[in-house]
Regions:
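Positively charged n-region of N-terminal signal peptides that target proteins for export
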Residues: 1-4
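Hydrophobic h-region of N-terminal signal peptides that target proteins for export
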Residues: 10-18
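Outer membrane beta-barrel
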Residues: 21-37, 47-162, 170, 179-181, ...
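Outer-membrane beta-barrel pore domains
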Residues: 23, 30-46, 65, 82, ...
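Short, low-complexity, polar/charged sequence segments that are solvent-exposed and flexible
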Residues: 46-50, 123-127, 163-164, 175-178, ...
Length: 313
């Protein structure tokens, strides 16, 4: 069944920051409220139209001493099971910084998957790929990061609970990442093995690339997914891209696209299900009214058009 979705939203986001003089405690409050209209095959989707409260986050982080630091983000508008307040906790982790090269992290953290769309905070995204919409990206685990002497490259190794451990089957994910910062070119790449059933894995190759040209930048991501049951390249993959330009200190304009496809019969991909081939195209602007480049308050206006087949319920 072919589905066509058009969305037009007016978005306002407010960021309030409160911090003590000490570096030990830094407290932030984030919220985002939208007015949106969504249509499916020309008919208004009433449940997804009107005023919506999207995010209400509390962020607490700080530096304890030269070696120890912590970070915590709680999503106050996210439902959680009665027995697990962690369901609404995006992350809470402790970091030990051995020296300028090595650091170690433990707690609930972001699953180490490459790509700029995946790396950005959800509050800063307006429409996303089908993969992004369905990946449970915060899990308990441990990681270590090595940064080169010049500071241009960092390599992360992580072991954490699998994003697909829905039935508490003791499943794990193994992730390797490269963060590169080289002037006009930056990167967030990863290779991943995510256990979706006992002893069965789905493998990712995720290549996030950012190209900078003056006030403009192009973020282009490619992700390929495969299990032992289907061919490795291009049968199950996603492409995400965004071209943006800061017109001045207060106005940013952007165009964005994503393409998700799964032409396999494998049950391993739980984010982009078999039979999916969907494209999203859109554009928008961000306006920051406060002076001196202050981004604690912003307004958004954007439109998105989606078409294709979606195997996800």
């Amino acid at each position: 069944m072919k589905k066509i979705i058009c969305t037009l939203c007016l978005v306002m986001s407010v960021l309030c920051v409160m911090a003590q003089d000490s570096k030990v405690v830094n407290l932030q409050l984030e919220t985002r409220m939208d007015y949106q209209r969504e249509y499916l095959d020309g008919e208004a989707v009433k449940a997804n139209s009107g005023f919506k409260g999207k995010y209400l986050n509390v962020i607490l982080n700080g530096t304890i001493n030269e070696h120890w630091s912590y970070s915590y983000r709680q999503r106050l508008n996210k439902a959680h099971a009665d027995q697990s307040f962690f369901d609404a906790t995006d992350w809470i982790h402790l970091t030990y910084r051995l020296n300028d090269n090595w650091s170690f992290n433990g707690g609930k953290q972001v699953v180490g998957i490459g790509g700029y769309e995946y790396d950005r905070a959800p509050i800063d995204l307006y429409f996303c790929s089908e993969y992004w919409n369905n990946i449970p990206c915060y899990q308990l685990g441990v990681s270590t990061t090595y940064t080169t002497n010049k500071g241009n490259d960092s390599f992360l190794a992580q072991i954490c609970e699998s994003p697909f451990n829905f039935q508490n089957e003791d499943l794990y994910a193994y992730n390797l990442m490269w963060y590169g910062s080289h002037g006009w070119f930056n990167s967030i790449w990863s290779v991943n093995a995510q256990e979706f059933a006992p002893g069965k894995f789905i493998y990712y190759l995720a290549l996030g690339n950012e190209f900078r040209f003056g006030n403009a930048k192009l973020q282009l991501d490619f992700m390929n997914r495969a299990t032992d049951d289907h061919a490795f390249f291009l049968k199950d993959c996603s492409v995400m891209g965004e071209l943006s330009c800061m017109v001045n200190k207060k106005l940013n304009v952007f165009g964005r696209m994503s393409y998700d496809v799964n032409k396999t019969n494998s049950v391993g991909d739980m984010c982009v299900l078999p039979g999916t081939e969907i494209t999203r195209l859109g554009a928008g602007l961000e306006y920051y009214p406060l002076p001196e480049g202050n981004r604690n308050l912003r307004f958004h206006l954007y439109a998105c058009h989606s078409y294709g087949k979606n195997g996800n319920p």
